[in-house]
């Protein structure tokens, strides 16, 4: 069992909590007492960036509501409130359906905050949903925006799923079947990114945004990664671009300006020792041995030690 207690203005002191466990027949099968100490202090504003990927499609699927509907935005609002409450201040923002953790050739439910129209080969964009999303982040105290990845995972060869109304027909125009370095997507990014960044600046949130190309470029697809990065970078001048990167040699070559390093990377000591403007760290499902994580089967000290490590190594 995991039990959270809300102080709700209680005076500092020690409060006994008694927990009883009953079976389906209402027979008591266990009992424990816990003395909860409330100290006379509040945590200050978080001094680091903290993000967990926030998937709006999962909210829609789990609750059975139409994505981008009023009901969906109401739920997103509630989830954002909890997200912020747990100390998260940077949120994945799906300008297009995030191409994350998706089997090659398959799709996630469409979660696209930017409306795309193509008429006689010319693109135009609607940003009302994106503005509504950003307003909810402001309402809930989420300061920073992590713009969804511009290319697919595991090779960066393809485009994210993008839906558009083309000469009156609503359909998918990019996805696993379109090349990330192809002329069609180049043309699209050249039209889209200037419009997006202009809106972010007009709304006063540009300085709080981070952009992604794709995760973990490796030796095998490094040329493709660099080509795609160079497609986007001219339109993102002044914005910070960050990606998961665990090969220190690639950082030395300037492949990624703001690398996010796996906590079990063999090159982590090199990253920690480097003179970097920001030091980022991540863990996901593969960090199972020797490092911190928050798997439910782990003892809680393996989770809590992360705070000490972030402080010790001055992680951003």
Q: At which residue positions do the language-model features occur?
A:
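Aromatic- and acid-rich polysaccharide-binding/catalytic face
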Residues: 171-172, 242-266, 280-282
């Amino acid at each position: 069992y995991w039990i959270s207690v809300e102080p709700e203005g209680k005076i500092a002191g020690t409060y006994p909590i008694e927990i009883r466990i009953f079976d389906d027949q209402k027979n008591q099968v266990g009992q424990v007492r816990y003395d909860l100490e409330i100290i006379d202090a509040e945590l200050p504003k978080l001094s680091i960036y903290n993000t967990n990927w926030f998937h709006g499609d999962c909210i829609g699927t789990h609750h059975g509501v139409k994505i981008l509907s009023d009901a969906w935005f109401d739920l997103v609002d509630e989830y954002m409130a909890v997200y912020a409450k747990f100390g998260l201040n940077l949120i994945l923002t799906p300008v297009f359906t995030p191409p994350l953790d998706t089997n090659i050739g398959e799709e996630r439910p469409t979660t696209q905050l930017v409306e795309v129209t193509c008429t006689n080969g010319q693109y135009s964009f609607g940003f009302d949903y994106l503005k509504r999303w950003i307003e909810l982040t402001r309402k809930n105290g989420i300061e920073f925006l992590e713009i969804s990845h511009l290319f697919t995972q595991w090779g960066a060869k393809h485009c994210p799923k993008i839906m558009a109304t083309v000469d009156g027909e609503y359909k998918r125009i990019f996805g696993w079947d379109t090349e990330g370095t192809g002329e069609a997507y180049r043309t699209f990014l050249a039209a889209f990114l200037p419009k997006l960044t202009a809106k972010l600046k007009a709304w006063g949130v540009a300085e709080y945004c981070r952009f992604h190309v794709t995760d973990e470029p490796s030796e095998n697809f490094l040329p493709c990664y660099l080509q795609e990065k160079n497609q986007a970078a001219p339109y993102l001048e002044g914005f910070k671009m960050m990606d998961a990167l665990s090969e220190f040699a690639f950082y030395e070559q300037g492949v990624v300006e703001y690398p996010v390093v796996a906590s079990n990377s063999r090159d982590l000591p090199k990253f920690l020792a480097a003179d970097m403007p920001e030091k980022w760290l991540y863990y996901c499902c593969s960090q199972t041995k020797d490092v911190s994580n928050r798997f439910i089967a782990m003892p809680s000290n393996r989770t809590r030690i992360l705070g000490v490590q972030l402080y010790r190594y001055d992680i951003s």
